[in-house]
């Protein structure tokens, strides 16, 4: 079973009136619920922290929110953001996940992976190789690419027109590029942070 946690509201960093902000947050959450249902996931959790402003929230609070959800659902595998995404919220969520999953004797989290986020992961321009997203795990998604595109269409407010990185064409192109790295049509790439066997 898969459970997603949305820590930030995803909207409050965009200037708008309170009524419109509330409506947009509710729409975003409705879309996420629809995606979860279509994908066979458990109902997602929404924490509604301020968007693109997690650096204004005490770090301990973020880590404790994540730790509470981990203790509640007891996942063996966690997927989180890449530590060097351009988005400050992604950076802090990564650090909070690492903090919340520190390897204590009774931990049940055996695998932690970082995923790439179009329009955030690739926008962190740096010459330092150790700061780039260099995947070491690839999953063949050739059989699921059309389903992924259908599900992504539910997130109407997040998708953009080509050539934006969050356009359907760009997302499919990224999957094709990752697939070409392992000799398949389409793939998704990850960084292994922890894998206990």
Per-range role (PLM):
Residues 1-21:
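ATP-dependent adenylation/pyrophosphate-handling site
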Residues 23-31:
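N-terminal Rossmann-like or analogous alpha/beta NTP/dinucleotide-binding catalytic cores
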Residues 7, 46-50:
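Short glycine-rich catalytic loops that host catalytic nucleophiles or stabilize transition states
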Residues 32-36:
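Conserved SAM-binding loop
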């Amino acid at each position: 079973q898969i459970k997603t946690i949305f820590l930030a509201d995803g909207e409050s960093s965009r200037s708008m009136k309170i009524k419109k902000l509330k409506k947009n947050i509710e729409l975003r959450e409705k879309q996420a619920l629809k995606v979860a249902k279509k994908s066979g996931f458990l109902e997602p959790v929404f924490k509604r922290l301020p968007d693109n402003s997690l650096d204004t929230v005490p770090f301990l609070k973020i880590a404790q929110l994540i730790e509470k959800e981990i203790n509640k659902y007891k996942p063996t595998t966690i997927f989180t953001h890449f530590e060097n995404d351009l988005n400050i919220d992604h950076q802090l969520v990564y650090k909070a996940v690492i903090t919340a999953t520190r390897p204590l004797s009774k931990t049940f989290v055996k695998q932690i992976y970082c995923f790439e986020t179009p329009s955030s992961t690739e926008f962190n321009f740096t010459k330092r190789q150790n700061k780039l997203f260099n995947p070491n795990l690839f999953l063949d998604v050739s059989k699921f690419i059309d389903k992924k595109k259908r599900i992504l269409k539910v997130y109407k407010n997040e998708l953009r027109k080509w050539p934006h990185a969050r356009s359907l064409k760009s997302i499919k192109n990224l999957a094709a590029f990752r697939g070409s790295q392992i000799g398949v049509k389409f793939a998704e790439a990850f960084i292994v942070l922890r894998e206990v066997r």
